[in-house]
Amino acid sequence: MTLTRRQLVAAFPAAIAAGLPRAARAEGGRRVVTFWFGQANSDGQAALRNDLVEAFNVSQDKYLLQLEVKGAAVNNLLKIALLAGNGPDIVQTAGPAYLTAIANAGQVLPLDDFAEKYKWKERFLPALLNTSVYGGKLYALPRDYESMHLFYNKDLFKQNGWKQPTNRADLEAIAEAALAEGIVPFGAGNADWKGVNEWLMTVFFNNVAGPDNVRKALSGELPWTAQPFVEAVELSKAWFNKGYFGKNYFSLTVEQSFLQVVNGKAAMALSGTWAFGTKSYGMSKPDTVMDVMSVPTLGSAFTGSLVHLACGATLSIAKNSQNPEGAAAVFEFMLTRKFYETMNRDWPGKWALPIKDLSPEMLRGIGFPLFETTIASLHDAFSKGQYGFTTWTFWPGATNSYLIEGIEQVWLNKITPDAYLTRMQTLFSQEAKEGKVPPLPPRAA
């Protein structure tokens, strides 16, 4: 039976009812592959529907991909479903820090056989692929690669004679000048996503303490209570209390706060490459007011600027999946050039698969110059081992949860930086003993 275009599109929002038997379902002679996705705005949902679900379903006649957008609750829903032996065939997590728990619990399949069949290990950047290797086995593919960046309103910079900052002194000079003009230095808000806290702390830990010290701490060679990390937390508190992140951090959403920069109400934003995927920011337009750069040093540990190695999401196959071959076929489809170009054109930054062979022609096919140059520079830095470490990729789960929640207590003067880091070290030590710290990529030669 050949499905019509309408039938294929209809498969996108198909409900995946709780408690369905685990036997693989079939529709129209095809074996169904189920996939739950987290948050996606209207542009993202359209890209998922057109560039992934429909495109995969028309590319072959053996499997039928059904995807359901679950929203912010997806992590909890997945956790419950996996414990019950139900849930989707394709398991997406919010990064290796989240993958560790389900891999250790045996809730996802090793992908080594599929990796050998499809030559995945030869096609992905090792620094990203290795973040999903536990006990010598590959449990996930990285869906994307990300980094924190400094986005800024280039028109506002020009009007005020501000130059690209190269160090902490430069950044703080711009911040103070902005405050004097009634401009928010950094557009920021976590009303709809507490994870903004860890975006900022990724920058402070790496750009103050330095990536070498962060690596040592993640390896257990240096405690989180060491002075470089105290200085990082103290600087984050100082900036928050000076008003560098505005007066409405807890009431503004991510989009509202970034639009402050676009509209000239704020000068800069510390955000990630995923920001390219929000069309309201207008960064794909030739006349965009926005520009972007890597984040400059904020301490004495290094000079210059730094990108931060991140895998924003991982893709695994559930242990109880009755259609692992179909799920692997979806992964293989995601590695096609057409998918890379169309998905990154329609939803930039959300599906920048960390493939080794990222040709200039592929990037030009996206048609988004600012995104293309940023991704190309990231690809180069990650290939050469020149990067810091993001919390959502390399911190273990409980430690990272406390990092996010506890830092607000520091900023609001309820606990000291020392108390915050002492608690973090306690949690980290316990998780390290339990083997829950995500693997680190090898040091660059």
What are the roles of these predicted feature ranges?
Residues 112-124, 190, 207-231, 281-285, ...:
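Short, solvent-exposed loop/beta-turn-alpha elements that line the ligand-binding surface or hinge
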Residues 88-89, 118-155, 184-188, 302-308, ...:
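A structural signal for short loop-to-beta-strand junctions that line the ligand-binding cleft
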Residues 2-4, 9-100, 104-105, 114-118, ...:
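Conserved N-terminal structural module of periplasmic/extracytoplasmic solute-binding proteins
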Residues 135, 139-143, 148, 172-222, ...:
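Extracytoplasmic/periplasmic solute-binding protein
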Residues 69-77, 168-170, 249-262:
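Short helix-initiation/N-cap motifs at beta->coil->alpha
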Residues 94-149, 172, 178, 197-201, ...:
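Hinge/lid segment of periplasmic solute-binding proteins
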